[in-house]
């Protein structure tokens, strides 16, 4: 009776948090796959725009790739931090046998404050951080959210755009070391020729 009022044990709390971290990690994997799929579509669209002589639209699309790659970097960093939080929690739990309760951890607090800034994780990390604060692991969290849309493309970013344009148009398909069928060889040659023509068009547009 009244078992629902019972305070969760450190083991129960850590198990719950690690389960939530794994769930969020899977969600980030789904986002990464979606970004990769969209990036492939954008690359095809850039080639089409360059072929049509529309460099302005091509560069606008290239900016989307710059932003998507930055988003992927943030997601990979978040995944690594969540894994570190999970390991720190497990280590902290092992210490409860000596201390009797979950100890305060500046490492966990720092990583949680970083994770909470990502819009994708803000809500879940806020709730988890509140529970960790009550459990004595950390102090109050900073609730600032990182605005991914507020990044301006300055000169450095413009260089990134040009780099991506060159990367897309210069790099041909990767050829396997295994022998290719005749029709496959023809397709590879044709794609390289098309990319070379697109690069010439781009240079002409820039001049």
Curated annotation (Swiss-Prot):
Bias class Basic and acidic residues marks the residues at 183-207
In terms of InterPro entries, this protein maps to: Snf7_fam (IPR005024)
Cellular compartment(s): Endosome membrane
GO annotation terms (biological process): endosome transport via multivesicular body sorting pathway; late endosome to vacuole transport; protein transport
> Is Coiled coil found in the keyword set?
yes
* Keyword terms, alphabetized: Coiled coil, Endosome, Membrane, Protein transport, Transport
The cellular component terms of Gene Ontology attached to this UniProt record, alphabetical and capped at eight, are: ESCRT III complex; multivesicular body
Q: Which family does it belong to?
A: Belongs to the SNF7 family.
What does the subunit comment say?
A: Probable core component of the endosomal sorting required for transport complex III (ESCRT-III).
Biological function: Probable core component of the endosomal sorting required for transport complex III (ESCRT-III) which is involved in multivesicular bodies (MVBs) formation and sorting of endosomal cargo proteins into MVBs. MVBs contain intraluminal vesicles (ILVs) that are generated by invagination and scission from the limiting membrane of the endosome and are delivered to lysosomes enabling degradation of membrane proteins.
PANTHER family per UniProt: CHARGED MULTIVESICULAR BODY PROTEIN
**What name has this protein been given in UniProt?**
Charged multivesicular body protein 3
Give the organism, scientific name.
Dictyostelium discoideum (Social amoeba)
């Amino acid at each position: 009776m009244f078992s629902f009022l019972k305070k969760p044990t450190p083991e129960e709390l850590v198990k719950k948090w690690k389960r939530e971290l794994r769930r969020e990690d899977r969600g980030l994997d789904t986002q990464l796959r979606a970004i990769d799929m969209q990036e492939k579509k954008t690359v095809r669209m850039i080639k089409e725009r360059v072929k049509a002589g529309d460099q302005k639209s091509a560069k606008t699309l290239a900016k989307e790739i710059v932003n998507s790659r930055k988003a992927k970097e943030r997601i990979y960093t978040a995944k690594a931090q969540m894994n570190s939080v999970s390991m720190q929690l497990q280590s902290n739990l092992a210490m409860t046998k000596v201390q009797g309760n979950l100890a305060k951890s500046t490492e966990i607090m720092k990583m949680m404050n970083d994770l909470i800034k990502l819009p994708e994780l803000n809500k879940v990390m806020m709730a988890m951080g509140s529970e960790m604060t009550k459990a004595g692991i950390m102090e109050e969290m900073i609730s600032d959210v990182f605005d991914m849309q507020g990044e301006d493309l300055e000169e450095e970013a413009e260089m990134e755009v040009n780099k991506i344009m060159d990367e897309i148009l210069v790099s041909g398909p990767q050829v396997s070391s295994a022998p290719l069928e005749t029709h496959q060889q023809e397709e590879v040659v044709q794609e390289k020729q098309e990319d070379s023509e697109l690069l010439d068009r781009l240079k002409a547009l820039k001049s």
